[in-house]
């Protein structure tokens, strides 16, 4: 063996022994981000100063005070019938009392028994509590078929989101920080102590998250700058120069690399506080013939524009949406000792979200749910902290956790999901592009079928003491182990306020040893213990009244019947909409003003979507109302009158949920539908599965929400002098893009009525639909009867209204025979009922002229609507033919219409007014809002006129008819005695 070989052996031996020595040394274990030592929590920040947040600032009064028992001020005895007015009167009465030193006015006590509520109960003043006499003693049944939340704790939203303010100057404000610097000194006397900290969502941050694009090369669902801004609602606790101290921690770092942050001040005038609902059972009635019925109450309790409020010791049954929903404008809310049972709804998106928050500093503790969907859920950009403590979900249909975009500072503490998952992760395109759903959040002593804990860029998520299958690259510690303290939330609270919090915590004990090597004595004791029934959280919650007694005692308190109940004021009606002298009038006034269509596809729930949204009578967003959501129809009417709108033209939506906005034709793999929902006329059957993943439609039954909302608007229209233009059908579903037909209720795959259309669908070129001829074909007896029944529903729904104009359908370019059929059904219905609704003929010119040439059909027509044709500026007619199986815009692509002008609009309207003097004529064609004066001077109806027009001219025009002028620029209305002259050059009116 030569020297070189010897050296090689020696080096090899040295390396081996050195490696063994290194392996023999115990590796240094990284310090956990959080651990308990001698009963004290120890936090280890990262290199930027971020640490696990202190979640204990959640709940009523930031959990620093227990929920108080408030004195009863009025009693509502049980009586048969609708109790809405009596209970609401009691709530309003207490709301009118002066508040005490602690901000409370008093409690309304419901006695033992069942109260039927057909309307909605609203707590709108601070310091008001609604109290039952016990979960097993007092029940409110949300009766009827409406979807209103049963109870709302609701103030006014007077806080406007601002994009500017004082700039935070720190380069980096870490997670859990409670102070920062701003770019100028603040004198608190010059401002409110209430601030919003706005953290912008910048392009570079979105790109780093990978949230700009979720696949397919399509970025429509990707995040856009400004769409995921966070708004931390805080109170200033102290100011030192330009250093601001706040009352609760930040849960997402404020980093100048990603836009930093700014603050702005607000006044808290609109938000209410110190309100609660307690000690009661809330039940929704429902149609027992349909196990997935949705024409009943969706939410039991909504909390909106409120702080320091609560819901406690309540059992909920049969609600379709949420037991308790805390909206984004609420903070410091406690929901405790609540049980949600037997929800009734479809299985899918926006349903069965038993305990939901999009607010801040919300505490759900000791809450239990069965057969829900997202039972414990945190929503869109909830700024945190928010906490779920000692909660349990049994056999849900989907996961609990963060369900939308970037909720931060979420704690799941002693939470068990039996049969589904707990998830912190990236949802990608789900939930309309939710992407990263959560940041800087903790699972603590949780169990589930699976726990997902993923780490988003720029943030972290942590899981301690998890029992489950595991997934994710977040921080994991002590998996498959139960750790101390049992509850992180209450350990944090105890350390923060430095006092015993056991009375608030009420954590179920785990009293026995779990060693794998017990002594014989311990084994015997545990064997004996195992034979006993295990204590269940549901039972523990049911015993809450023994641990935290809510008083139902009262002395010298009157009942609401003794105090007095205000009588309902019957609304007054405007003069009836009718045709007088061939024009539409209400009383002695012409009906004039703008018309608005509805938004029948697209949309979302983000601020930009809401800002761009149009009115829609039958749009539905569970638990939320307002522009772009479930429209508040009173607000819509007020806005219409303020903006010179006289009518809404309504047609049903192109499809129900926003997933189909992608224009795919595919069958959805689940019912994870996205709001806002454009409700359709027909009811779901509760049977089988339609193309959108919910149950199939029953075309013989009608969606009560849809028709009730239309009826409500029609009633308001009759009270306020407005008009509903009701399009019976919507042709867009059966022509053009194949996706238009995919979820259509009439499609054979989507209903239980055997409509007989080809299935699979024969899409042209595998993407276009040409089903108009089949849809309008009346040779199929099943379809013919369904059409007849549906048309009668369109009429019957408004039988007691006068301000509704019925049209055959939006975009109708169909054949003559279907219009005849439509009119036959109307004539038959009119004969049966003695009612005479206003019927407008709104079709192509050839079909219009053919109908009007037939006296029997012309007699049914009240209004001629010029919509799908017009005279072009050169005098020729743009007049596509009916029944050619082309949509209006397809005709336009072929025929390339030219614009009309004042003269030609006048010509068209006058032509039909002269030929059919007893019928009103509307012009809804090319650029109709610009030619309202032409319509007026031609004797037409519902013109869009300048708001500056003299009312005396309109009143005088009522009895006049168009006459020919010798001056080409003058248009004349006359009654033979006096005249109104309009000069198209000067654009001025003159009376002679």
Each PLM stretch: what is its role?
Residues 817-926:
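Glycoside hydrolase catalytic-domain groove-lining segments
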Residues 555-575, 889-992:
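Aromatic- and carboxylate-lined catalytic core of secreted/periplasmic carbohydrate-active enzymes
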Residues 120-124, 137-155, 181, 265-270, ...:
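Glycine-rich beta-solenoid repeat tracts in large extracellular/virion proteins
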């Amino acid at each position: 063996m030569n020297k070189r070989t010897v050296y090689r052996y020696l080096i090899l031996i040295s390396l081996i022994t050195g490696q063994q020595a290194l392996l023999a040394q115990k590796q240094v274990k990284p310090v956990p981000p959080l651990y308990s030592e001698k009963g004290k929590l120890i936090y280890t920040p990262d290199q930027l100063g971020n640490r696990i947040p202190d979640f204990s600032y959640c709940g009523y009064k930031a959990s620093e005070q227990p929920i108080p028992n408030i004195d009863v001020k009025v009693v509502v005895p049980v009586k048969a019938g609708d109790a809405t007015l009596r209970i609401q009167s009691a709530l309003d009465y207490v709301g009118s009392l002066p508040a005490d030193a602690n901000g409370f006015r008093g409690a309304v006590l419901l006695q033992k028994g069942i109260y039927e509520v057909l309307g909605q109960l609203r707590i709108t003043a601070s310091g008001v509590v609604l109290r039952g006499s016990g979960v097993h003693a007092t029940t409110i049944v949300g009766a009827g078929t409406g979807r209103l939340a049963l109870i709302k704790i609701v103030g006014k939203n007077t806080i406007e989101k601002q994009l500017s303010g004082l700039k935070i100057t720190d380069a980096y404000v870490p997670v859990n920080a409670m102070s920062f610097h701003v770019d100028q000194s603040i004198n608190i006397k010059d401002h409110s102590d209430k601030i919003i900290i706005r953290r912008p969502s910048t392009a570079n941050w979105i790109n780093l998250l990978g949230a700009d694009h979720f696949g397919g090369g399509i970025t429509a669902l990707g995040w856009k700058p400004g769409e995921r801004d966070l708004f931390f609602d805080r109170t200033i606790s102290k100011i030192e120069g330009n250093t601001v101290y706040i009352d609760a921690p930040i849960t997402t770092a404020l980093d100048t690399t990603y836009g930093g942050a700014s603050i702005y001040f607000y006044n808290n005038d609109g938000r209410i506080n110190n309100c609660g609902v307690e000690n009661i059972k809330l039940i929704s009635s429902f149609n027992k013939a349909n196990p997935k019925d949705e024409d009943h109450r969706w939410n039991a309790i909504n909390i909106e524009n409120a702080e320091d409020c609560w819901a406690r010791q309540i059992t909920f049954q049969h609600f379709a949406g949420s037991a308790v929903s805390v909206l984004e404008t609420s903070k410091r809310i406690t929901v405790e000792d609540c049980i949600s049972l037997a929800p009734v709804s479809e299985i899918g998106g926006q349903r069965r979200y038993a305990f939901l928050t999009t607010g801040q500093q919300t505490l759900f503790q000791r809450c239990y749910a069965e057969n829900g969907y997202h039972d414990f859920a945190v929503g869109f950009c909830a700024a945190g902290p928010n906490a779920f403590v000692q909660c349990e979900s049994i056999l849900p249909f989907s996961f609990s956790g963060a369900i939308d975009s970037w909720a931060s500072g979420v704690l799941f503490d002693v939470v068990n999901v039996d049969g589904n998952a707990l998830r912190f992760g990236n949802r990608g395109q789900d939930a309309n592009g939710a992407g990263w759903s959560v940041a800087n959040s903790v699972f603590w002593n949780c169990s589930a079928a699976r726990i997902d804990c993923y780490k988003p860029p720029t943030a972290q998520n942590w899981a301690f003491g998890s029992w489950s299958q595991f997934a994710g690259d977040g921080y994991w510690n002590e998996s498959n182990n139960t750790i101390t303290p049992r509850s992180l939330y209450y350990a944090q609270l105890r350390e923060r306020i430095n006092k015993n919090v056991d009375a608030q915590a009420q954590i179920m004990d785990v009293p026995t040893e779990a060693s794998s090597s017990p002594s014989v004595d311990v084994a015997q004791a545990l064997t004996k213990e195992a034979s006993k029934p295990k204590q269940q959280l549901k039972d523990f919650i049911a015993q809450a009244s023994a641990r935290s007694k809510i008083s139902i005692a009262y002395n010298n308190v009157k009942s609401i019947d003794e105090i007095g109940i205000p009588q309902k004021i019957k609304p007054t009606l405007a003069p009836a909409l009718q045709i007088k002298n061939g024009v539409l009038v209400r009383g002695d006034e012409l009906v004039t003003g703008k018309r608005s269509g509805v938004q029948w596809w697209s949309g979302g729930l983000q601020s930009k979507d809401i800002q761009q949204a149009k009115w829609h009578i039958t749009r539905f967003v569970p638990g939320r109302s307002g522009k772009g959501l479930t429209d508040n129809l009173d607000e819509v009417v007020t806005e219409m009158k303020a903006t010179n709108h006289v009518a809404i033209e309504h047609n049903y939506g192109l499809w129900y949920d926003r997933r189909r906005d992608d224009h795919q034709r595919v069958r959805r793999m689940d019912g994870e539908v996205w709001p806002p929902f454009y409700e359709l006329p027909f009811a779901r059957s509760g049977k089988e599965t339609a193309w959108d993943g919910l149950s199939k439609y029953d075309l013989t039954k009608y969606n009560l929400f849809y028709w009730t909302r239309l009826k409500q608007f029609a009633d308001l229209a009759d009270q306020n002098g407005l008009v509903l233009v009701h399009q019976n059908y919507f042709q867009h579903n059966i022509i053009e893009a194949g996706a238009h037909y995919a979820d259509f209720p009439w499609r054979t795959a989507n209903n239980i009525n055997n409509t007989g259309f080809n299935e699979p669908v024969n899409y042209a070129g595998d993407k276009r639909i040409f089903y108009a001829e089949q849809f309008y074909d009346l040779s199929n007896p099943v379809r013919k009867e369904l059409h007849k029944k549906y048309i009668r529903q369109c009429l019957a729904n408004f039988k007691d209204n006068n301000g509704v104009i019925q049209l055959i359908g939006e975009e109708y370019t169909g054949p003559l025979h279907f219009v005849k059929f439509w009119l036959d059904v109307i004539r038959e219905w009119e004969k049966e009922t003695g009612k005479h609704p206003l019927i407008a003929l709104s079709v192509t010119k050839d079909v219009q002229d053919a109908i009007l040439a037939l006296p029997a059909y012309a007699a049914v027509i009240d209004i001629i609507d010029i919509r799908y044709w017009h005279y072009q500026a050169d005098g020729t007619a743009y007049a596509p033919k009916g029944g050619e199986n082309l949509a209006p815009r397809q005709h336009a692509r072929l025929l390339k219409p030219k614009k009309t002008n004042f003269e030609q609009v006048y010509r068209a309207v006058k032509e039909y007014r002269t030929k059919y003097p007893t019928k009103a004529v509307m012009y809804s064609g090319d650029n109709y809002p610009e030619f309202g004066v032409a319509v007026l001077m031609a004797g037409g109806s519902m013109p869009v006129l300048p708001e500056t027009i003299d009312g005396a001219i309109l009143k005088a025009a009522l009895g006049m008819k168009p006459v020919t002028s010798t001056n080409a620029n003058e248009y004349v209305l006359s009654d033979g005695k006096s005249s109104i002259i309009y000069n198209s050059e000067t654009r001025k009116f003159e009376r002679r």
